Amino acid sequence: LANGGVTTLQILPGSANLFGGRSVTLKNVPARTMQGMKFPDAPQGLKMACGENPKRVYGSKGREPSTRMGNMAVNRQTWIKAREYQKKRAAGKEQTRDLGMETLADVLEGKIMVHNHCYRADEMANVIDMSKEFGYKVSTFHHAVESYKIADLLRENGICSALWGDWYGFKMEAYDGIKESIPLVH
C-alpha cells in the first residue's frame, strides 16, 4: 500500500566534473546500511556535466576544461580512451585496471545509464551527437532549462529532462528558462 510521498531516491554525485561518478537508487526504507536500502535491480547510472560548472571549477585553476568547447574536447578524448579500454577488455588483452575506464566501458556496452547536468539546448544537442558518435545512451538531462528549444530532438532520442517548474535565470546558462518549459517538453 502506498500512501503517497517519496518512495524512491536516486543519489547522484555533484556537477563540477565532466564525469562525476556513479549513482545509486534507494528505496526510502529503514535500514542500517545503504546496501539494505538499494532498489533491487535498479539500473546503474553515471552522472556527467557540461556547461559553466566544469569550466568554472577547472578553468579557475588554470586547467582543462576552461571553456564550453574545452568541455566537449575533454569529453571526446575521454570517450576515445574508454573505447580503446573497452576493446582491449573485450579481446581479453592485459591492461592496467582503471575503475573510471571500466565504468565508461560499461556505459558504452549499455550497462550504465548516463544522466547529464546540462542547461543549454546547444550543449544538449552536442552531447546527443557525441553519444551517437561513441554509441552510448543519454537517459536524462538534469536542470535542462532549455529543453523546450529541442523538445523534438529529445523525443526522437528517447531522452528525459529533469526540470524545475519555476526556477531559472539564477545564472548565465539558466537565463533562457521559461515557466512553460515543462508543458512544452512533456
Regions found by a protein language model. Give the residues of each.
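Aromatic/His-enriched, Gly/Pro-containing loop or helix-boundary segments
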Residues: 2-3, 174
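Polyanionic/metal-chelating signatures
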Residues: 3-140
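Short secondary-structure boundary/hinge segments and terminal tails
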Residues: 18-20, 149, 171-172
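Amphipathic coiled-coil/heptad-repeat helices and related helical stalk/stem segments
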Residues: 100, 123, 147, 177-178
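His/Asp/Glu-enriched, well-ordered alpha-helical/loop segment
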Residues: 113, 152-186
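Short acidic loop-to-helix transition motifs that present clustered carboxylates
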Residues: 121-123, 144-149, 169
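Short hydrophobic/aromatic-enriched beta-strand-loop microsegments
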Residues: 136-143, 160-165
